[in-house]
Curated annotation (Swiss-Prot):
Keywords noted in UniProt: Carbohydrate metabolism, Glycogen biosynthesis, Glycogen metabolism, Glycosyltransferase, Transferase
NCBIfam families assigned to the protein according to its UniProt record, in alphabetical order: branching_enzym, PRK05402.1, PRK12313.1
One Gene Ontology MF term: 1,4-alpha-glucan branching enzyme activity
UniProt-annotated catalytic positions: D274, E327
Catalytic activity, reaction form: Transfers a segment of a (1->4)-alpha-D-glucan chain to a primary hydroxy group in a similar glucan chain
Pathway annotation from the record: Glycan biosynthesis; glycogen biosynthesis
Protein function: Catalyzes the formation of the alpha-1,6-glucosidic linkages in glycogen by scission of a 1,4-alpha-linked oligosaccharide from growing alpha-1,4-glucan chains and the subsequent attachment of the oligosaccharide to the alpha-1,6 position.
Record note on quaternary structure: Monomer.
A GO biological process held by the record: glycogen biosynthetic process
Record organism: Streptomyces avermitilis (strain ATCC 31267 / DSM 46492 / JCM 5070 / NBRC 14893 / NCIMB 12804 / NRRL 8165 / MA-4680)
Record's protein name: 1,4-alpha-glucan branching enzyme GlgB 2
Amino acid sequence: MMTHAGVLGTRFTVWAPNARGVRVCGNFCRWDGAAFPMRSLGSSGVWELFVPGIGEGELYKFEITRPDGTHTVRADPMARRAEVPPATASIVTESSYAWADGAWMAARGERPVHESPFSVYEVHLPSWRPGLTYRQLAEQLPAYVADLGFTHVELLPVAEHPFGGSWGYQVTGFYAPTARLGTPDDFKYLVDALHRAGVGVLMDWVPAHFPRDDWALAEFDGRPLYEPEDPQRAAHPDWGTLEFDYGRKEVRNFLVANAVYWCEEFHIDGLRVDAVASMLYLDYSREEGQWSPNEFGGRDNPDAVAFLQEMNATLYRRVPGVITIAEESTAWDGVTRATHDNGLGFGLKWNMGWMHDSLGYVQHEPVHRKYHHHEMTFSMVYAYSENYVLPISHDEVVHGKQALVSKMPGDWWQRRANHRAYLGFMWAHPGKQLLFMGQEFAQGAEWSPEHGPEWWLLDDEYHSAGDHRGMRDLVRDLNTLYRAEPALWERDTDPSGFAWVVGDAAEDNVFAFLRHAADGTPLLAVSNFSPVVRHDYRLGVPDDIPAWQEALNTDAARYGGSDLICPDPVKPESGEIRLTLPPLATVWLRPA
């Protein structure tokens, strides 16, 4: 919306270089664009038109004449607002939102995320509390997350998408928050509320592909435009979607500007970039003969590499204090290395290897875990090759994979004990944490995108509510202690911030390690993944610590454990302390 020559109206622009003609149509002209032909801006491929009297709330699309003379009607790729699906029109909108998160924004870039606590609660917005709007969520979600001590939320889905079952991973409106939950200003209200509660906001961002809907980006002006012309490179084999043409400068600009837009316009603190591996490899999920190599005969996609580098460098330059996080499932070198050192430039990377191995370990019966001991220790071989997030995400608790507590062996008590011990190990392990909703209170059912978390498990009327509240209390205490202990986050990317104490006790199912803060202050984490109590278990400790005090014990009665705790300080003798290790539990100790 703008004023031109003293007249209020809306200026429409669209990139359609292959079009023979473009017209604006909408409810203001009964969807007949004959009266609103757009003019070409020459070799740029952009068409534009100022329409007087068109303002907030007007529905519109572009009527495009293809090179062959046929017509197609398309939504605006850069629309700031869209209709509620299944309707597909774009909506003229102008924000009037007045932000109240100035204190958060001013402090956002004060300390590098790698040297700060970073604990993420992953939220599927439509199902966290089904039926709530952005503004209604703002009345509940910030308080809940802040109470549990998470530093950030990661929200999905955010950008507009036609198929709800895609969970937002098949985007058509890259610049529009999904209208299912409200307007763009309503979404800003939610972000604002989270910031005012002291919670950072990450969003899932999907520049890897887009759906084939005939009103959206696919063959937008009658020719491949946002997608490569080579059909083998264009078609994404896993999802039936189309990949972006990262070698085309206009497409790169569309995506880079989009990343900046979310962080500047909506105060988003970070982007978790989905499916990075599928962008980096030309042969991703393709058989021999189904892909074409790059100009050097290789399988990597240099255009995608250049795009990711440009996106990260531009975002960090334009919006200091934001973080980008790669969901990258291969061993690509330099995902979190700086772009000036020829890395991709991400701030963090999901540690899919740690997730796969550690979940594999805890799913075994304790008697068999000794044969899989390396699955819990191998992560430290490469822990400092990238800057990692340890993700227990939505992908791990759906499609037959079971909820986290249900992955664990044994009876209900043992499953909960395993769950608690695992989270204690995870929060102490080098790397940042991410936990999907519902796992913080050990719901036993898989995540349902329709029904969301099973909140009734926490109700007074439910006979086992205490079991689930105990797990939630543990997550709260894990986050509280984590944020208070610099040893657990200050040197996450520094190998000298970690040392094994016991890494080879496969027969015992025991792991013990030290974490060190920048000033050298240690924290000792000990995990016993056996149902057997270990009496007088010897652990070597630094000589300069006169006594150790239990800071957290996942076996405490308040969490639902057997309450085998040690309230008194433990003094070392000859460089060792002797502990009684509770069954299926993790214990943290700090200098007394």
